[in-house]
């Protein structure tokens, strides 16, 4: 932290499940998750630092502008395989998903798929950026990424007639919303608490918003 040079921060990736396990084992002081905790993870102390929408993305040239959540579930389960059933071209849908253990995948599974598995024929990638790149170069593909990562390379579908936006996330009309969590073993203290307090401060929340996430304060 530039304002507190005595506090060093080492950030490692690996997905939400890795963040949860690292926190539970004591391998880190702050774990991170971009999905809700599972029942067997609730022994951790969780702090919501931001919220984020999940966007269902397609190539900008795709004439399909929206879908229902039920249709999205059918696409990712492999039951709906052609764009013509959504008013698009008579072309097979290329499905792109995230890897197991990803918080984005976990949130999508919980919010869209429920107990239904994503079908085996889907292309699996290990980052939101890679999913976006594939969709940006395949006119007949579909994937899901953080709403904050949607750019001019791809287009987000309206879901059940609602566009993903900060306003619609805050008013509850856009349903694909997940938390960004900090996790600790018990109430945070010392430098850990100082860092979390900074993230929740006006300055920290402004940085959250700058990164495309929805501040909680």
What would you call each of these model-derived segments?
Residues 1-217:
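Exported/periplasmic ABC-transporter solute-binding proteins
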């Amino acid at each position: 932290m530039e304002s507190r040079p005595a506090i060093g921060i080492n950030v490692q990736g690996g997905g939400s499940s890795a963040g949860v396990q690292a926190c539970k084992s004591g391998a880190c002081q702050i774990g991170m998750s971009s999905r809700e905790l599972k029942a067997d993870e609730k022994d951790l102390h969780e702090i919501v630092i931001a919220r984020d929408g999940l966007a269902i993305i397609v190539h900008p040239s795709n004439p399909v502008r929206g879908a229902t959540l039920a249709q999205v579930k059918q696409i990712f389960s492999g039951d709906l395989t052609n764009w013509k059933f959504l008013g698009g071209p008579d072309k097979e849908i290329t499905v792109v998903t995230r890897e197991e253990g990803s918080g984005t995948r976990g949130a999508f599974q919980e919010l869209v798929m429920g107990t239904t598995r994503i079908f085996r024929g889907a292309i699996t990638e290990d980052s939101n950026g890679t999913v976006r790149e594939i969709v940006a170069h395949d006119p007949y593909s579909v994937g899901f990424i953080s709403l904050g990562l949607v750019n001019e390379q791809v287009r987000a579908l309206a879901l059940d007639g609602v566009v993903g936006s900060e306003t619609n996330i805050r008013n509850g009309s856009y349903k694909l919303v997940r938390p960004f969590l900090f996790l600790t073993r018990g109430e945070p203290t010392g430098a850990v608490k100082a860092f979390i307090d900074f993230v929740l401060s006006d300055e920290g929340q402004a940085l959250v918003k700058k990164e495309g996430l929805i501040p909680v304060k």
